[in-house]
Amino acid sequence: MKKVLVSVLSFAFIAATAGSALAAGNKAEGAKVYKQQCAACHGDTGKGDGPSAKTLKPAPTNLTDAKLMSSLSDADIAKVIKEGGAKVGKSPLMPALGATWSKQQMDDMVAHMRDLCKC
């Protein structure tokens, strides 16, 4: 009976872990999309210092700010990307990308942003 219980619990753990690993974003893929669609404002390294940033008021968010980024859940970050800044009380200059990005692209971008802030 003990062996059966250990086997069942082991299987449940592996299944749960595998499912979350498959759902996680790919930070390398996120970095590719970031470079194409985000770096002009947020900068190559995420500091909010992209070539367009000088003319933007408010300035783009510094995505390397670990204190700020740690205070946001992955869902919070995805919501800003999906709905745009104006809808969530952030900069109205941040576009809503939910209509053009897949769930996987959102997950990939969140993974890349977590890599930028090391949080």
Question: Residue spans of the language-model regions?
Answer:
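A short gly/proline-enriched turn/hairpin at secondary-structure junctions
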Residues: P51, T64-D65
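Axial heme c-ligation environment in periplasmic c-type cytochrome domains
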Residues: K54-N62, D76, V80-D107, M113-L116
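Sec/Tat signal peptide C-region and signal peptidase I cleavage site
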Residues: T17-A23
